[in-house]
Amino acid sequence: MILNSIKSLIKKIFPFTNNIRYDNQTVKIMEIVLEPDSTFIDVGCHKGEVLDQAIKFSPNGRHFGYEPIPHLFSDLVNKYDNKCQIKNFALSDSIGESEFHHVVSNPAYSGIKKRSYPGNENVNKIKIKTTTLDYELINESRVDLIKIDVEGGEYGVLKGGKNIINKFHPVFIFEHGLGASDYYDTNPSDLYDFFESLDYNIYTLKGFINQSTVLTKEKFVDLYLRNKEYYFLSVFKA
């Protein structure tokens, strides 16, 4: 009984400490990548914690936040007023409507598809609107950094943005983890091949900060399958 309780506690603490590490690394990367007039895109904006940092590092830039959950969207609109463009969409590879699993008890786990959850969660199905990165951003003058945190739907987001990727070559910080992306019938080889076809390299967040070697396909797949890392960075090879 005691051993089971300890194991349960470790399972809860491990992702929490990892998330703190990823948050700190994300801020460091934003400090490296963003210029005062950079354009930042927050896909899965949630409460705007990352968007806050974009405003700090790029006070003269244009910033976009995408959040499909109605009450979070309303909170973001009130929070940012005219500082950012906040949009009530989920990003995908198509424009239209979709069923969306709103995890009421833990909104950060919400997504178009129901994924595995660490506990018993209260999930409501709602209808949301979808759009694509290409449709939203193709007429912008620059796009510098895109953060994607959509609980497994990241490959769809990327496929909907091939034109803006080729035009702007933005840096990507993206979540890609076992227990989420596999519910979208996506595997790490798909993402690696996608980025490779566009002349992008993939790093761990720490690897990019420390200017380490790029991830090979085998290493990227291995980190995913062993759940050793679930946040990554991709950057154009130029």
Q: Regions from the language model: what does each represent?
A:
Residues 1-238:
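Phosphate/nucleotide-binding beta-alpha loop and adjacent structural elements of enzyme active sites
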